[in-house]
Amino acid sequence: MQIILLEKVVNLGNLGDIVKVKDGYARNFLIPNKQARRATKEALAEFEVRRAELEKVAAEKLAAAQAQGEKLAGSTVQINQKAGVDGRLFGSVTNADIAEALVKQGFAVEKAQVRLPEGPLKLVGEHAVQISLHTDVLVDVTVAVIGEHV
């Protein structure tokens, strides 16, 4: 299916690009999330009329994400979790736990924005985690997992 991207999509293209994707990806994800639109003649004409407005909105989102990223960059989040004597956690620290701790500190972060490349944290100590505030804005945050010995 040919679609017009209404915003930048990772591994696909930028605002205004016309790309071919699988029908299910377009119908079930991109179009419902208002990230794309079918590439018909009418849609292309309407897009060209609204292009400046969409670019302005995209620039505002990027600026807001960069401002939040500057505040968030280099910060440390402490999470208490029950742990054994050897430093392994009972359970793990997930992206939802990290997002919740950041929200308590006053940052608007959703769990889908937290990137844990090695999976959930299972050891006591400091871990580097990335927060994806925008497709172009990645921020490094330190998560200090403090073990409560049982």
Swiss-Prot record:
Described purpose of this protein according to its UniProt entry: Binds to the 23S rRNA.
GO MF annotation: an example: structural constituent of ribosome
This protein's record includes keyword RNA-binding: yes
Pfam families (UniProt xref): Ribosomal_L9_C, Ribosomal_L9_N
InterPro entries per the UniProt record, alphabetical: Ribosomal_bL9 (IPR000244), Ribosomal_bL9/RNase_H1_N (IPR009027), Ribosomal_bL9_bac/chp (IPR020594), Ribosomal_bL9_C (IPR020069), Ribosomal_bL9_C_sf (IPR036791), Ribosomal_bL9_N (IPR020070), Ribosomal_bL9_N_sf (IPR036935)
Similarity field: Belongs to the bacterial ribosomal protein bL9 family.
GO cellular component: ribonucleoprotein complex; ribosome
PROSITE patterns according to UniProt: RIBOSOMAL_L9
Protein name as it appears in the record: Large ribosomal subunit protein bL9
Keyword terms of this UniProt record: Ribonucleoprotein, Ribosomal protein, RNA-binding, rRNA-binding
Annotated S-S bridges: none
GO BP term (any one): translation
Domain of life: Bacteria
